[in-house]
Amino acid sequence: MKFALVLLGVCAFYLVNATGDLETELEASELQELQEALDLIGETPLESLEAEELEEARKFKWGKLFSTAKKLYKKGKKLSKNKNFKKALKFGKQLAKNLQAGEEHEPGTPVGNNKCWAIGTTCSDDCDCCPEHHCHCPAGKWLPGLFRCTCQVTESDKVNKCPPAE
């Protein structure tokens, strides 16, 4: 609550200062209202704000929040005992770990830093992938955040354009 009032005060102060050149366009009553709002914020004692926050916390229905959390916990515990769910979770964790870390394997010839990444691993260019693979970007250069580039098997129309390591 304090933060919101301070932020409102800073914004109002900024607006008042920023509109100094535009006073002719704004009506005097609007500027007066902004100034009164700033004065009101400055006059409000912090103790009353803390009391308001405490009152809001007392009115909040904590029991409902705790019962909802307890229900979610019980559902999660029940799901964790399901064998199919355990298998799917284990597979998902392993897949995420492999995609994130990038599995290394022995390259046919040295490329870039003498390491190359497994198929499906995120890459930035062909030098990240093995010589027999290439870096494929489905979204091109315009949206790499949504569709990541990955190392793929080199086909007849695609080639690894990374120069051989010296």
UniProtKB/Swiss-Prot annotation:
A GO biological process held by the record: defense response to bacterium
InterPro entries for this protein: OXYTX_ICK
Gene Ontology molecular function terms on file: toxin activity
Region (Linear cationic cytotoxin domain): 59-99
Subcellular location(s) of the protein: Secreted
Annotated propeptide span(s): 19-58
Keyword Signal included in the entry's annotation: yes
Tissue specificity as recorded in UniProt: Expressed by the venom gland.
Cysteine-cysteine disulfides: C116-C130, C123-C135, C127-C162, C129-C151, C137-C149
GO terms for cellular component: extracellular region
Top-level lineage group: Eukaryota
Role description: Has antimicrobial, insecticidal, cytolytic and cytotoxic activity. Active against E.coli DH5alpha, E.faecalis VKM B 871, B.subtilis VKM B 501, A.globiformis VKM Ac 1112, P.aeruginosa PAO1 and S.aureus 209P in submicromolar or low micromolar ranges. Lyses human erythrocytes. Kills HeLA and A549 cells.
UniProt remark on domains: The presence of a 'disulfide through disulfide knot' structurally defines this protein as a knottin.
The name this protein goes by in its record: Spiderine-1a
Organism of origin: Oxyopes takobius (Lynx spider)
